[in-house]
Amino acid sequence: MWATCCNWFCLDGQPEEVPPPQGARMQAYSNPGYSSFPSPTGLEPSCKSCGAHFANTARKQTCLDCKKNFCMTCSSQVGNGPRLCLLCQRFRATAFQREELMKMKVKDLRDYLSLHDISTEMCREKEELVLLVLGQQPVISQEDRTRASTLSPDFPEQQAFLTQPHSSMVPPTSPNLPSSSAQATSVPPAQVQENQQANGHVSQDQEEPVYLESVARVPAEDETQSIDSEDSFVPGRRASLSDLTDLEDIEGLTVRQLKEILARNFVNYKGCCEKWELMERVTRLYKDQKGLQHLVSGAEDQNGGAVPSGLEENLCKICMDSPIDCVLLECGHMVTCTKCGKRMNECPICRQYVIRAVHVFRS
């Protein structure tokens, strides 16, 4: 280890060999990803909808549309058509029309796209989901369209399922009316008149469908009328100040009707926690409205129908009939009544955009 050529102690140039420790042995290279445990077996096939495992391959059915596996309960076959899952059947029943797809739930749209492996992560609107469905719609033959529209009566369960999204749009027929009367209501008036002329007389059974058809059209015509023109309380419409004939009528109003009257006349009811507080504001509004109307009508009677120039300044500059009782914001001009103020998009004086119209009470 030490050089003996001179009296100097010099290190030898060869490194000292360190004997391997006992118990250590050379280990061959091994793959770190290798595991001595047996590889896991493949997942058992299960239904995509309910998650039930298939006991045998006979219960496994493949949807022709989304190509996913379903059980016998979650898939069906309408007539001689292809076997589809229940969700794909609902979409095929719409014939992939935009109007029908917009009526479906967002969850159903997302589930359908998920079955077709289409990501909906960036979709924020329902219309975007409908566009994705329309972009990947399968090819539907004319036979499938007719089968979806007119189903075979031999499959009532499938017919009830496919027509379920549209059941809310069909008005229920009265059980007292016979089936012939229900069919006669769809007959056009021109055809009814031709049948009357051909038969020479009209029976009572033939007159009833025409009468029912005319009565059914009355609510649609009434809905188009203005709310302000109605003078009596009608269920399903908002209450109005013109419905009140006396102060005693205010006591019979509900809390919702009181709030509707205040909201229609631009009176703020925030902070009112009790019903009597709402009644107090409606009473004040009613008295103020009646007082202004009596003031204008009394001045017209004294002057023979003409409004004096002093009171003309207090009349609405739009209708020239009701007194000025609201202020337009943000400009602050008082030139209209409440009825005309809520229809103003811009101030008639300064042409500034109207953000809000607020009812004011005169002292």
From Swiss-Prot:
Q: Which UniProt keywords apply?
A: Apoptosis, Cell membrane, Cytoplasm, Endosome, Lipoprotein, Membrane, Metal-binding, Palmitate, Phosphoprotein, Repeat, Transferase, Ubl conjugation, Ubl conjugation pathway, Zinc, Zinc-finger
Q: What is its EC number?
A: 2.3.2.27
Point out which parts of the chain are RING-type zinc fingers, as ranges. 316-351
Q: What is its main location?
A: cytoplasm
Query: Per the record's keyword annotation, is Ribonucleoprotein included, yes or no?
Result: no
**One GO CC term on file:** cytosol
Where does the record place the region Disordered? 165-209
For membrane topology, the record states:
Peripheral membrane protein
Per the record's keyword annotation, is Lipoprotein included, yes or no? yes
Q: Which reaction does it catalyse?
A: S-ubiquitinyl-[E2 ubiquitin-conjugating enzyme]-L-cysteine + [acceptor protein]-L-lysine = [E2 ubiquitin-conjugating enzyme]-L-cysteine + N(6)-ubiquitinyl-[acceptor protein]-L-lysine
Which positions bear Phosphoserine?
A: 226, 229, 232, 240
Quaternary structure (record): Interacts with CASP8 and CASP10. Interacts with RIPK1 (via protein kinase domain); involved in RIPK1 ubiquitination. Interacts with PRR5L. Interacts (via RING-type zinc finger) with p53/TP53; involved in p53/TP53 ubiquitination. Interacts (via RING-type zinc finger) with MDM2; the interaction stabilizes MDM2.
Record's protein name:
E3 ubiquitin-protein ligase rififylin
Source organism (scientific name): Homo sapiens
